[in-house]
Amino acid sequence: MRLTAKQVTWLKVCLHLAGLLPFLWLVWAINHGGLGADPVKDIQHFTGLTALKFLLAALLITPLARYAKQPLLIRTRRLLGLWCFAWATLHLTSYALLELGVNNLALLGKELITRPYLTLGIISWVILLALAFTSTQSMQRKLGKHWQQLHNFVYLVAILAPIHYLWSVKIISPQPLIYAGLAVLLLALRYKKLLSLFNRLRKQAHNKLSL
């Protein structure tokens, strides 16, 4: 049985709740002592992990829609991507304001050098910003064939974000490994497309070097 447009609309409502409820919980935890001994680290971890969850969920939609034969499910992908960007922005903001502090934002450059995993996080966020900004149908029409080329960069985020997570933890635990494994699995489901993209980029690079 295929999903109807009405059912997809209700699914979107549920996804909005899934994006909003963690924020409400975080606000409650901050105000009621629900965080651990290092609340700043807990906030950063929670916001980053939630962003990663939405990224993986967005990547899951295409293979799920294909294998379950639910084409309308694709309509939820943009919503999941926007929630991923929202939580990634909260993650970056919590680091900039709570760890560095408003008066020490100039130290960000030094931090990027001493903590390379931060560079991966910043690159991922910039890509997500570009994808969120161009996610509308009007931007899709305006960019034409370049729209898909731009949005293929989500696969780079799917590589960089788990590495950022693994690199940022002092002790490797099962959790970051599980999320990294899920990212690898979701990318593996697209191996033909990724191989085609890689060959195309290699050909373009070769042509430019030959000029």
Swiss-Prot record:
Subcellular location: Cell inner membrane
GO BP, one annotated term: protein repair
Coiled-coil boundaries: none
Pfam families named among the record's database cross-references: Ferric_reduct (PF01794)
Bound cofactor: record note: Binds 1 FMN per subunit.
Needed co-factor(s): FMN; heme b
Bilayer topology annotation: Multi-pass membrane protein
UniProt entry keywords in alphabetical sequence: Cell inner membrane, Cell membrane, Electron transport, Flavoprotein, FMN, Heme, Iron, Membrane, Metal-binding, Transmembrane, Transmembrane helix, Transport
Entry GO CC: plasma membrane
Biological role stated in the UniProt entry: Part of the MsrPQ system that repairs oxidized periplasmic proteins containing methionine sulfoxide residues (Met-O), using respiratory chain electrons. Thus protects these proteins from oxidative-stress damage caused by reactive species of oxygen and chlorine generated by the host defense mechanisms. MsrPQ is essential for the maintenance of envelope integrity under bleach stress, rescuing a wide series of structurally unrelated periplasmic proteins from methionine oxidation, including the primary periplasmic chaperone SurA and the lipoprotein Pal.
UniProt name for this protein: Protein-methionine-sulfoxide reductase heme-binding subunit MsrQ
Species of provenance: Escherichia coli O127:H6 (strain E2348/69 / EPEC)
